[in-house]
């Protein structure tokens, strides 16, 4: 496998994503070529090194004070930034695609709220080791769990986006030449939401609760990306900034894993690739790439306030965004943006 970002996925990431496949829980179509042995038949030593490096990096970050977690596939492929006004949406890299099929009654989840919701779900599932999540007795109680103000904007968005998210269907697809692996993921198996949006502080007799789908629970608790929830909260005015933060944390995490397992220590990401991964609403032209790049770098300045050590491990070139291994886990960082 190519270790460069031309392939958009590192070896260990592909292994992590394909682990359910190797265990027989993913559907797969395979062209029986050399690619199969390259992608799926890593030597036991290679797998051992990668898995050990993942575990070490994860434990380092966990011990350093992670306050939140996010599924690795949601750090690579993102939700819509704005209402796409459609029932189907997909985004991703050349190797990984996240697609979302919205419930026709509730619409597509978009913006900052479902990003915070997904991070909270993952964090709670990791913290409690349970797929059963309590949302509280009213909306205000749940807003406090998300550390959001209990004003009209958030109350309305919370109700609409929570229902849109938990009633949507996710699909994650990983592809390489000759290999396709995919899995459909149900976010919530069942749930009871008793909120009255007109009376957000009115307590109900019962807790609102969700039971995560087994596939989603497994996906979000298997080697999730450690992060700081405080950073996501602070960056919530820009869904793109939230996406850049989680992606940067994830990519630095994977580079450190790669370095620990004796593999690649640098990733060169083409700007055109980042535009496909993050940028909706930009023209498919050189000017569209330049516009995306300018906005990405603008949002990155705010992101680096919450991951200052990463400054020393990133470079910008006309054609690429370059990341290098060595940045400390984000959870070890001292936030310098307390404003």
Describe the residue ranges of each PLM region.
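Extreme N-terminal basic, low-complexity initiation segments
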Residues: 2-7
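Charged, alpha-helix-forming regions
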Residues: 9-339
């Amino acid at each position: 496998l190519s270790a460069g970002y031309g392939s958009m996925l590192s070896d260990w990431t592909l292994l992590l994503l394909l682990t359910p496949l190797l265990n027989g829980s993913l559907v797969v179509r395979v062209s029986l070529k050399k690619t199969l042995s390259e992608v799926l038949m890593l030597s036991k030593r290679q797998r051992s090194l990668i898995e050990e490096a993942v575990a070490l990096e994860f434990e380092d970050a966990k011990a350093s004070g992670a306050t939140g977690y996010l599924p690795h596939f949601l750090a690579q492929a993102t939700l819509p930034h704005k209402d796409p006004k459609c029932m189907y949406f997909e985004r991703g890299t050349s190797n990984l695609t996240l697609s979302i099929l919205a419930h026709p009654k509730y619409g597509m989840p978009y913006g900052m709220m479902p990003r915070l919701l997904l991070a909270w779900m993952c964090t709670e599932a990791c913290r409690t080791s349970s797929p059963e999540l309590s949302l509280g007795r009213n909306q205000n109680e749940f807003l406090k769990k998300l550390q959001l103000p209990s004003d009209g904007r958030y109350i309305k968005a919370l109700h609409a986006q929570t229902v849109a998210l938990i009633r949507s269907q996710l699909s994650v697809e990983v592809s390489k030449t000759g290999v396709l692996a995919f899995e459909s993921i149900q976010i919530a198996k069942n749930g009871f939401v008793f909120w009255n949006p007109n009376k957000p502080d009115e307590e109900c007799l019962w807790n609102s609760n969700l039971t995560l789908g087994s596939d989603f629970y497994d996906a979000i608790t298997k080697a999730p990306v450690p992060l700081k929830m405080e950073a996501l909260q602070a960056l919530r005015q820009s869904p793109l900034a939230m996406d850049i933060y989680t992606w940067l944390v994830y990519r630095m995490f994977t580079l450190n894993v790669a370095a620990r397992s004796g593999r690649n220590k640098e990733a060169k990401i083409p700007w055109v690739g980042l535009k496909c991964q993050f940028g909706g609403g930009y023209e498919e032209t050189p000017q569209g790439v330049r516009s995306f790049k300018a906005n990405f770098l603008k949002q990155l300045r705010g992101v680096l306030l919450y991951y200052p050590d990463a400054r020393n491990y990133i470079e910008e070139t006309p054609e690429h965004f370059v990341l290098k291994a060595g940045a400390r886990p984000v959870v070890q960082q001292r936030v310098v943006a307390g404003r």
